[in-house]
């Protein structure tokens, strides 16, 4: 592998990924991942359409969790002095999760995900909201949707 790269540098040729990894499947290739020829009529995997639900859709389907979210929302709003500013585009679920992120009574929040923070607070008997735990344990609240990451998870310094 290294020998091929040094030879390409000596000869003045540019090395690309296809030279380094010749057996890797490419989308425009007619080879499967095990190196066997596949005709254009055959498909190595069946075409499957996967419908993904958003977190809000999933919560609306679950009546019990929907009621808990509504109760948590009402409880948070009762504690507040005024209406939240700049929350027109935030759903109730996102607002509850943001409230959990910014509430100091559940321990430190920098450098950990919401799930890690919730579990830590549970282990230290800080009584984190069960509603937040149920929301975070839903499949739709995975890392890809960034719901498990806290508000401050990828906090970066401001340049300048």
UniProtKB/Swiss-Prot annotation:
Residues 1-48 are annotated as: Disordered. Coiled coil: none annotated. Pfam families: DNA_pol_delta_4. Residues 8-17 have a biased composition (Polar residues). It is found in: Nucleus. It comes from the Eukaryota. GO terms for cellular component: cytosol; delta DNA polymerase complex; nucleus. Keywords: DNA replication, DNA-directed DNA polymerase, Nucleotidyltransferase, Nucleus, Transferase. GO terms for molecular function: DNA-directed DNA polymerase activity. Its main location: nucleus. The keyword Ligase does not apply. Signal peptide: none annotated. One of its GO terms (biological process) is DNA-templated DNA replication. Transmembrane segments: none annotated. PANTHER family: DNA POLYMERASE DELTA SUBUNIT 4. Heterotetramer that consist of the pol3, cdc1, cdc27 and cdm1 subunits. Interacts with cdc1 and pol3. Appears to have a role in the stabilization of the DNA polymerase delta complex. Belongs to the DNA polymerase delta subunit 4 family. This is DNA polymerase delta subunit 4. The gene is cdm1.
